[in-house]
């Protein structure tokens, strides 16, 4: 697994397409659909985690894929308890993915930084 993280609109998808020789047809957009097997790349993991409180059962689907996830750990901590709880769950999921990933890359301003 390859994990690419970064803030919104920082160039994560463009980096993934170029670095891993992917096309738009290789990408499953989790913001608009549930994950399906056979894709080389899954993007918007945060959207899937908002719809589904327990996505850990889906993690094996991502084992041989590039996973693109929005980084949400910066900024102001939300006052809403449900939003804070989601951020905690999502952070734990990202930790699990990072642990299982061969490579972890953070993209900021279109620049890739290898973390693992």
Q: Could you tell me what each predicted segment is?
A:
Residues 6, 44, 109:
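Active-site donor-binding loop signature of nucleotide-sugar glycosyltransferases
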Residues 10-11, 48-49, 112:
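Glycine-rich nucleotide phosphate-binding loop and flanking beta-alpha elements
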Residues 25-69:
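Conserved nucleotide-sensing/catalytic segment adjacent to the nucleotide-binding pocket
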């Amino acid at each position: 697994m390859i994990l690419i993280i970064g803030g919104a609109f920082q160039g994560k998808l463009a980096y993934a397409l170029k670095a891993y020789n992917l096309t738009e047809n290789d990408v499953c957009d989790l913001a608009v659909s549930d994950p399906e097997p056979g894709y080389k790349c899954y993007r918007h993991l945060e959207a899937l985690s908002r719809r589904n409180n327990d996505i850990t059962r889906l993690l094996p689907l991502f084992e041989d894929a590039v996973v693109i996830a929005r980084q949400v750990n910066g900024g102001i901590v939300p006052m809403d308890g449900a939003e804070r709880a989601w951020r905690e769950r999502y952070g734990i999921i990202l930790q699990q993915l990072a642990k299982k990933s061969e490579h972890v890359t953070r993209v900021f301003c279109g620049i890739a930084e290898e973390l693992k």
